[in-house]
From Swiss-Prot:
Part of the ABC transporter complex LsrABCD involved in autoinducer 2 (AI-2) import. Binds AI-2 and delivers it to the LsrC and LsrD permeases. This is Autoinducer 2-binding protein LsrB. One of its GO terms (molecular function) is carbohydrate binding. InterPro entries: Bact_Solute-Bind_Prot2, LsrB, Peripla_BP_I, SBP_2_dom. Keywords: Periplasm, Signal. Its main location: periplasm. Belongs to the bacterial solute-binding protein 2 family. One of its GO terms (cellular component) is outer membrane-bounded periplasmic space. The complex is composed of two ATP-binding proteins (LsrA), two transmembrane proteins (LsrC and LsrD) and a solute-binding protein (LsrB).
Length: 339
């Protein structure tokens, strides 16, 4: 009898250990940037990892060394095969990741996007820094604050012709220019492909090709500092350089007066919000339009319909969480931020 009891206790212990291991595996979240080695994505990853520690969730930050569909797909497949229960990805393409993401969802993995979305049917929730209307309008307004002429020449310069988020913002920005600044001529739209060296070469090429350029609008973490550096290299103080990047990268250009205004959002908080939302999905199964989540030190966020991003697709368990605020950085406030 004593031997039988001991065997039963041993079996219960083994089952308890197995259950504990399973629970731990179910709380692993992968947080994937477009590529590693860029301050913007590193800051988002730091926020994600910090949120994971606060929640008791194991968060892994990893991405490709170059922004490619193949690189992200390989990581997604690896995380799925390793038993991760949620993946949050900044997509380099709206459709290129979809087959891999749909396979992951079929295996029970929660799929979210952050920073740059996929087609909405390929994920559950998109953690969105701002709607295209908000961010496209922000870009034009920053340029208009400096370009006072009715007739002006403007260039757009960002990462690539296929990346989801930036192309949505640029479309809205160009529409706003056509409606509100009909005398502005968009002389070129060029790309740096997330490469610092190529971005600097491209920015210098733009400035050399248009000696009378009034503004460069660069909504990309590599393109904006490259445009600022190009303006300094070529001594083009009369060009308004605006766009999106991190304050730590842009601080020297703001302090020297090369850049008067640029914008962003708190990407550290974007990483934190992403993990809180992913964790909530792991606990509840779904989040639907109208559901709210109170995140410590950030506040209340709400799931809103996909249509705020211009999509037609709506479904149960599918929507967008928009960050509560965006920031315009100037010499007066930039030292209040460290990311």
């Amino acid at each position: 009898m004593k031997t039988l009891i001991l065997k039963k206790l041993a079996l219960i212990s083994l089952l308890s250990l197995a259950c504990a291991s399973w629970v731990h595996a179910a709380e692993r979240i992968a947080f994937i940037p477009k590529l590693v080695g860029v301050g913007f994505f590193t800051s988002g990853g730091q926020g994600a990892v910090a949120a994971g520690k606060a929640l008791g969730v194991n968060v892994t930050y990893d991405g490709p060394t170059e922004p490619s569909v193949a690189g992200q797909v390989q990581l997604i497949n690896n995380f799925v095969n390793q038993g991760y229960n949620a993946i949050v990805v900044s997509a380099v393409s709206p459709d290129g990741l979809c087959p891999a993401l749909k396979r992951a969802m079929q295996r029970g993995v929660k799929i979210l996007t952050w920073d740059s979305d996929t087609s909405p049917e390929c994920r559950s929730i998109y953690i969105n820094q701002g709607t295209p209307n908000q961010l496209g309008g922000m870009l034009v307004d920053m340029a208009a604050n400096q370009v006072q002429k009715k007739q002006a020449k403007v260039a757009f310069f960002y990462s690539s012709p296929t990346v989801t988020d930036q192309n949505q913002w640029v479309k809205e920005a160009k529409d706003k220019i056509a409606a509100e600044h009909p005398g502005w001529e968009i002389v070129t739209t060029q790309f740096g492909y997330n490469d610092a060296t190529k971005s600097l070469q491209t920015a210098e090429g733009i400035l050399k090709a248009w000696s009378d350029l009034d503004a460069i609008i660069a909504p990309d973490a590599n393109a904006l500092p490259a445009a600022a550096q190009a303006a300094e290299n070529l001594k083009r103080q009369n060009v308004a350089i605006v766009g999106f990047s991190t304050p730590n990268v842009m601080r020297p250009y703001v302090e020297r007066g090369t850049v008067k205004q640029f914008g962003l959002w708190d990407v550290v908080n974007q990483g934190k919000i992403s993990i809180h939302v992913a964790n909530e999905l792991l606990k509840k199964g779904d989040l639907n339009v109208g559901d709210k989540l109170d995140i410590p030190d950030i506040g209340m966020v709400e799931v809103v319909p996909n249509r705020v991003q211009g999509y037609r697709y709506e479904a149960k368990g599918n929507g967008i969480v928009v960050l509560p605020e965006r920031v315009i950085f100037t010499k007066d406030n930039i030292n209040q931020y460290d990311f």
